[in-house]
């Protein structure tokens, strides 16, 4: 089992900041983060569509230029929103990166930029078209994210068929779906790696082993 720091371990650090990535990197095998495009075109690291929840600014990230994002403070930390390139430079190359695509136009550039570094990179998305775009752009490893509001209604076969059609190496089901369905066992039987999100308690981690 390999620990993955979700948004750089958001319970310990201001999420998706350089301090989060630097602080969590020595303790994990991979870091998960979110890539989207800002208003001036750069690829930046930020989870939400809007700035409101975790910064002292408001508005959509997609409409806000990098010059403004460089001056916002994430969760009162004094840290701003980093570029993708800054994260690739900050994270040691022996720590993998799971780059979740946010927005429908970032796959190809994300793959191209990440390829300039030597990290193990998994490019992931909830959206099949984005996974396919990453694969078409040359991503070596892709993953399809799964989330089920009602795990009892989750169609495991259909989900895994979709991941197979996309030539994914991994599937990323949410923890409840992992624990309440046979998705982990069936995915492994079909040759997929499985990265669950997001285990928040020791008991969940032990159940996922």
Where does each model-flagged region fall?
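Aromatic/hydrophobic pocket-lining residues that form the small-molecule binding cavity
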Residues: 17, 80, 84, 110
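Catalytic domains of carbohydrate-active enzymes, especially glycoside hydrolases
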Residues: 20-37, 87, 163-171
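Structured helix-beta-strand junction loops
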Residues: 27, 64, 72, 93-94, ...
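Extreme N-terminal starter segment of soluble prokaryotic enzymes
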Residues: 1-4
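An active-site metal/cofactor-coordinating segment within enzyme catalytic domains
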Residues: 29, 35-90, 144-147
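Short loop-to-alpha-helix "cap/lid" segments that border enzyme active sites
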Residues: 90, 100-209
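C-terminal helical cap(s) of enzyme catalytic domains, especially alpha/beta-barrels
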Residues: 23, 43-44, 206-209
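Entry/capping segment at the start of metal-dependent catalytic domains
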Residues: 8, 12, 16
């Amino acid at each position: 089992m390999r620990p993955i720091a979700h948004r750089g371990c958001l319970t310990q650090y201001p999420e998706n900041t350089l301090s989060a990535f630097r602080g969590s990197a020595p303790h994990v095998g991979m870091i998960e983060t979110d890539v989207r495009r800002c208003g001036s075109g750069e690829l930046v690291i930020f989870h939400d569509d809007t700035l409101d929840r975790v910064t002292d600014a408001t508005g959509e990230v997609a409409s806000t230029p990098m010059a403004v994002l460089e001056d916002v403070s994430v969760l009162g930390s004094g840290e701003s929103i980093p570029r993708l390139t800054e994260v690739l430079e900050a994270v040691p190359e022996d720590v993998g990166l799971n780059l979740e695509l946010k927005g429908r136009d970032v796959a190809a550039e994300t793959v191209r930029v990440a390829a300039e570094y030597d990290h193990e990179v998994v490019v992931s998305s909830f959206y099949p078209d984005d996974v396919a775009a990453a694969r078409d752009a040359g991503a070596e490893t892709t993953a399809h994210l799964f989330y089920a509001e009602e795990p009892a209604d989750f169609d495991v076969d259909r989900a895994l068929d979709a991941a197979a059609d996309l030539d994914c190496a991994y599937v990323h089901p949410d923890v409840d779906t992992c624990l309440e369905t046979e998705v982990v066992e069936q995915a492994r039987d079909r040759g997929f790696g499985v990265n669950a999100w997001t285990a928040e308690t020791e008991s969940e981690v032990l159940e996922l082993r």
